[in-house]
Every structure is written in C-alpha cells, then in structure tokens.
C-alpha cells in the first residue's frame, strides 16, 4: 500500500483545512495572519488534547462521553487544592491522579459489568459532574467566577510561546507525537486495532484486553486532567463546567479524522487535522459574525456528513457494484 492510499483521508483533511482558511481569509483578511491563526488555537486546542486518547478508545470499540465532567472535576480539584495552600508542584500531579482515577473507574465498570461503554460513561458523566459541583459548593465558589487566586506562574503558562508557538499548541503537538508513536508504532498500539475489529478473536489470540482498556481509559482521564490544567491557566479560574461543551466537537473530530465509530480503524493524525478543521471553522464563522448557535448546528451537520462520507468511502466497491447491477437490470428491462 503506497502513501497515497494509506494516508489518503489525512491528505484530504489537510487540503480541506487549507481551502477553509483561504475561503475565510477572503471574507476576513485576519484569517490569513499566521500570528492570529497560531494564537487562536488556544481557544479550541484543549479539545484536541482529549480527542487524541479518545480516538484510541473508539478504535478499540469503546466510547467515553464522561471526559467533559472529568475536566470539570479535575479543574475544581486543582482549585480546592490551591485554596488549601497545596503548592502547584504537588497539586498538578495530584490533579493528573484524579483524572487517572476517573479513567480507571470507567474501565473497571465496563470490564466487570459487561455493560455497553456508552451507558457506563453516561453514568460516570453525571457522577463526576455531580462530584465537581459538590466540591465547588464546599469551596464556596460561585458558578460563574469559579475558584481563582492561582499563582501567576500557572496563569501565565497558557500565554507563553515556544519557538513562536503558543504553549497549549506545543503541548497538543507533543500529545499527537506520543499518541501516534504508541498507537501506530508499538505492539500494544496494534492490539487496539485488533480488539476493535473483534474482541472475540483478540481474546483467542491471548491479547491482554483488560490491561489495554485500562490503559486507554486511564490515558483519556489523564488527558482530561491536562486539558483542565491548561483551561485553568487560560481562564485564570477553575469551574465545574469547563469541559461541558467538549463532547460534540471531540467526537466529531475523532469520526471526521477517520475513526470507525464501531471500532477497528482510526488515525491520530486524522484526528489532529480534524481538530484544526473544526476549530478554524468555528473561528472563521465567529469572525464572519455568525451566531454560536449556527456554528454548533454546522458542527453537528459536519459530524453527520463525516459519518456518511466515511461509510461511503469504506464501502465504495459494494456501492459501485450495486449501481452496476441496477443499471444492468434497467437495460435488461
């Protein structure tokens, strides 16, 4: 298989991204300013940080819709620890631990109950979200303001640049590299595809399904914690609703990036490109004065188009054969 066939969808997404930026640039020249393009990634790149491990979960045949609540819980946990006087050097690792525990809870419930991951993570979505609200109430934080008073070293992080790139974007690129190497260049990563294609065959092949799923859901929890820390740095406060709007864009990015929603196939690079495509779509629409409700509706339409388009691309041979048979029947009649 040559590069064009193997990465055809990724090349398509890259081309669409360039076309999108050029079209929005015609409407508003600010979209062609490289500095604005780079700095504006901080508005949506945290979604990408979570979408990367979510890609691996979906490729394995699972799903996790609780990550938005996990982000809120991790953010509030960081705020409460800061209020308690715990230094950031300890609070940040503890926040990552909170995210990891959320992932372990998801994996344990899925494995030991055998219930559909969608149902389990729907339950933990409310569990983690309720816990975040409880902690927020105990801390005395208001819903709008959240918990503030973070050290300047933390709040400055999201505004720093490295080699001309915003730190959140650099962190995202690092996550892309790590997830790509793990998923596409390690034995454990190849196991993810096998589990997603057929868990029964994977079990007969002695693939450690439980260990792999624990790892994937834990990584999603840790990524949620990382996103929470970056969001707290970006907004300067910790709120329980910080990840509330992440669900649809993240899943849309994973599916648009080439992942089969039923498992067995997917692409880290595809997800990364899809995040930029969706993020710049919303940025461009906002610059054009389009209301947020319309951009959300377009994101939903994009998800449907992605699912239908991906399905057509995967089954184009069958569709072509069906059209040929239909034509032959018409000619014979």
Curated annotation (Swiss-Prot):
Coiled-coil region(s): none
Organism listed in the record: Photorhabdus luminescens
Cellular location(s): Cell inner membrane
Lineage: Bacteria, Pseudomonadati, Pseudomonadota, Gammaproteobacteria, Enterobacterales
TM stretches of this protein: 7-27, 45-65, 70-90, 91-111, 118-138, 162-182, 212-232, 240-260, 261-281, 288-308
Function summary: Part of the ABC transporter complex LsrABCD involved in autoinducer 2 (AI-2) import. Probably responsible for the translocation of the substrate across the membrane.
Molecular-function GO term, any one: transmembrane transporter activity
Protein name: Autoinducer 2 import system permease protein LsrD
GO cellular component, one term: plasma membrane
């Amino acid at each position: 298989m040559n590069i064009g066939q193997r990465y055809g969808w990724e090349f398509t997404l890259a081309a669409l991204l360039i076309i999108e930026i050029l079209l929005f640039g015609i409407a508003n020249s600010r979209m062609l300013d490289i500095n604005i393009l780079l700095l504006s990634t901080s508005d949506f790149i945290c979604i990408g940080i979570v979408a990367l491990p979510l890609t691996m979960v979906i490729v394995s045949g699972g799903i996790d819709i609780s990550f938005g609540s996990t982000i809120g819980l991790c953010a509030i946990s960081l705020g409460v620890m800061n209020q308690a006087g715990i230094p950031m050097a300890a609070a940040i690792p503890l926040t990552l631990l909170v995210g990891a525990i959320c992932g372990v809870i998801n994996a344990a419930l899925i494995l030991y109950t055998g219930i559909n991951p969608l149902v389990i993570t729907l339950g933990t979505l409310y569990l983690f979200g309720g816990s975040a609200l409880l902690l927020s109430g105990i801390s005395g934080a208001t819903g709008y303001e959240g918990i503030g008073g973070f050290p300047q070293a933390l709040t400055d992080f999201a505004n720093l640049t490295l080699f001309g790139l915003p730190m959140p974007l650099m962190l995202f690129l690092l996550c892309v590299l790590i997830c790509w190497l793990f998923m596409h260049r390690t034995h454990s990563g190849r196991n993810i595809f096998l589990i997603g294609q057929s868990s029964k065959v994977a079990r007969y092949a002695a693939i450690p399904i439980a260990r792999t799923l624990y790892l994937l859901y834990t990584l999603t929890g840790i990524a949620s914690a990382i996103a929470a820390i970056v969001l707290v740095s970006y907004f300067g406060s910790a709120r329980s609703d910080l990840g509330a709007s992440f669900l649809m864009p993240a899943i849309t990015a994973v599916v648009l990036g080439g992942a089969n929603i039923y498992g067995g196939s997917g692409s880290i690079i595809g997800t990364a490109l899809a995040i930029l495509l969706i993020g710049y779509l919303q940025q461009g629409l906002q610059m054009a004065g389009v209301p947020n409700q319309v951009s959300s509706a377009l994101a939903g339409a994009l998800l449907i188009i992605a699912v239908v388009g991906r399905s057509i691309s995967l089954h184009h041979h069958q569709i072509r054969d069906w059209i040929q048979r239909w034509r032959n029947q018409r000619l014979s009649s």
